[in-house]
């Protein structure tokens, strides 16, 4: 039986309307056990200022972003279930959901799935990687009962 341990940190000022811990656990359980037996993930919900600072420091981008992924790298020869940390910016997620006409819950779920895949080693730097990652995201989101998060882009093509 797989086990995903969640450490949820609420570092944003306003907690009203945030998904609860059970929802975050469900979203992690929808993606990680497909790839590994045990994992521990920290999800830190932050405001724009912290997201902006981290995005500038680690990615050189001078703006807040929806989700940042920080994979844990164990020292050689040491096996640990720590997968890494997801930093999710509440305001960016809410703004994107509104701009993209997506249900807010579905967009939160997508950010957890997207960030988790980054922790598992997936990326979207080149087109082939992006296609593979987006395909996995879509498959996972559909399996959890949500729409394809990229449906609007596919219709526009």
Curated annotation (Swiss-Prot):
InterPro entries: MetalPrtase_cat_dom_sf_prd, YbeY, YbeY_CS. Its cofactor is Zn(2+). The keyword Hydrolase applies. One of its GO terms (biological process) is rRNA processing. Zn(2+) binds at residues 114, 118, 124. It is found in: Cytoplasm. Keywords: Cytoplasm, Endonuclease, Hydrolase, Metal-binding, Nuclease, Ribosome biogenesis, rRNA processing, Zinc. Its EC number is 3.1.-.-. It comes from the Bacteria. One of its GO terms (molecular function) is zinc ion binding. Binds 1 zinc ion. GO terms for cellular component: cytoplasm. Single strand-specific metallo-endoribonuclease involved in late-stage 70S ribosome quality control and in maturation of the 3' terminus of the 16S rRNA. Belongs to the endoribonuclease YbeY family. HAMAP family: Endoribonucl_YbeY. This is Endoribonuclease YbeY. It comes from Salmonella paratyphi B (strain ATCC BAA-1250 / SPB7).
